[in-house]
């Protein structure tokens, strides 16, 4: 268990490979402003961002604030049974500052979150490294506000086996939504998007 007191500001990041049955909560701030900033693609240069997990199961993150991320603020790779609830993300670093990235993961619920990011707010993607399906992903009752990116994007990285049972609902979006953008041939099934307010929805 990781508890961040609601009056605390912690400078650093959370990084975990292979963790199980972890709860992270508390209402405080996790500030990533001390991590090195680079102007190239941060993922390729091993910058971790504020919160990154690999191959994890049964992770619950609630009520914390993530800010000033050097790259994707909250990202998960090859994870399952992840619950993100009432998390606030604020980041204006203009290079690769996605809000939440769900990569080759399954059984993920993201709800009641506020995300202000310069790049994509929520991005669901698959990369060649894992070659696993991405399935059972729900985004519910979230407020999303991006800069030059997209709100709720599926892609552009779609190098996976299958996308299945993905739902966006009851969300407020500040700008356009790019639902599907693929450079690979990938099967999609059971996809649903029900927004309360947004400017436009686009599938490409």
Language-model region placement:
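Extracellular/periplasmic carbohydrate-active domains that bind, remodel
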Residues: 1-204
């Amino acid at each position: 268990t990781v508890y961040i007191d609601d009056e605390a500001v912690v400078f650093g990041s959370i990084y975990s490979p292979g963790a199980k049955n972890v709860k992270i909560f508390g209402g405080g701030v996790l500030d990533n402003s001390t991590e090195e900033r680079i102007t190239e693609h941060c993922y390729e240069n091993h910058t971790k961002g504020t919160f990154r997990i690999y191959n994890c199961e049964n992770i619950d993150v609630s009520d914390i604030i993530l800010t000033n991320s050097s790259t994707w603020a909250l990202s998960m790779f090859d994870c399952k049974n992840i619950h993100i609830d009432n998390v606030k993300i604020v980041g204006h670093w203009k290079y690769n500052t996605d809000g939440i990235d769900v990569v080759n993961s399954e059984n993920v619920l993201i709800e009641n979150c506020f995300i202000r990011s310069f790049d994509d707010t929520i991005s669901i993607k698959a990369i060649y490294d894992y070659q696993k399906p991405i399935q059972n992903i729900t985004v519910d009752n979230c407020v999303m506000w991006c800069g030059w990116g997209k709100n709720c994007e599926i892609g552009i990285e779609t190098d996976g086996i299958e996308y299945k049972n993905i739902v966006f609902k009851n969300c407020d979006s500040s700008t356009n939504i790019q639902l599907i953008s693929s450079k690979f041939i990938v099967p999609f099934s059971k996809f649903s998007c029900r927004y309360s307010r947004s400017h436009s929805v686009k599938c490409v």
